[in-house]
Amino acid sequence: MELIVKEESKTDYNYGSDPYKRDIKTLLNTGLVVIDKPSGPTSHEVAAWVRNMLNLVKAGHGGTLDPKVTGALPVALGNTTKCVPIWHIPPKEYVCLMHLHDDAKLEDIENIFKEFTGRIHQRPPLKAAVKRSLRIRKIYEIEILEIDGRDILFRTKCQSGTYLRKLVDDMGEALGTSAHMQELRRTISGPFYENEAVYLQDLLDAYIFWKEDGNEEELRKLVKPLEYGLQHLKKIIVKDSAVDAVCHGATLYSSGVSKIEKGIGTDEVVLIETLKGEAVAVGKPLMNTKDMLKTEEGEVVEITRVIMEPGIYPRIWKKRNKNDKTKAESKKK
């Protein structure tokens, strides 16, 4: 990540805090944990277990896995639930065991896998909790790892919302053998990886250790601040004076910007951060990095989702009344 300074600015440490230095109670209400989901429970049940064991008001998972599917299941804790839609932006990766219902030649199998790379059409399965309309999904990568008789182990990197069970069914039909998904494990879920996923029992043990002995070290290793789940987004760093206005949903203006990440375009989602590294909001850039650096006034980011609660930073901005807005528009004309 390369940040370009638009205007040097200092932060006041009387307000806000470094995300990695939040007290443990705040962390539990503004954090996340990546669970290694076991086979059996639904994703909703796992999120509910996490909520109950950490004694939280709410928790939500970041991407449904069928009961028998295992792997990386990010769980948003407390107020972090508002970040869940942002986790769906990056691709997801799975390792799948596919079973053919008849014999097939290696060459034919390899050709079918090539055919199902790129843009594919999918209709959600009957059991899906969405409208069964035809949709386009992207298969970024698909790789055969091992073939043992009629069993094919493969890895795929795909767009969020891709139905792997349907992908296997469609490949089996195209191959002429028919097929079904025997096992599935999610290895990457957006910005989260399998190797950082933790077992439910380990999370419970760490929580009990903190509650009974006052030692929060193990719990801090497992629970990450919400900013950890937004690392995949390009950043715009704002001055302290702009934070509270953005927290109220105001458009970000050029005068409130301190630093801009290199390479921002108008076709992506960006993260608005404080000088301490706290997530404030996400939004749609109205111009690219180069133009943001040049402009001295005007709107630069349209806010689409506020993350930080208002009131953490001082309110320096003033509400514009309708008369002010009308006068400003008249001046433009």
From Swiss-Prot:
Keyword RNA-binding set for record: no
SUPFAM superfamilies (alphabetical): Pseudouridine synthase, PUA domain-like
Coiled coil: none
Molecular function in Gene Ontology: RNA binding; tRNA pseudouridine(55) synthase activity
PROSITE patterns registered for this protein in UniProt: PUA
Active site: D66
Name assigned to this protein: Probable tRNA pseudouridine synthase B
Native source organism of the sequence: Methanococcus maripaludis (strain C7 / ATCC BAA-1331)
Taxonomic placement: Archaea, Methanobacteriati, Methanobacteriota, Methanomada group, Methanococci
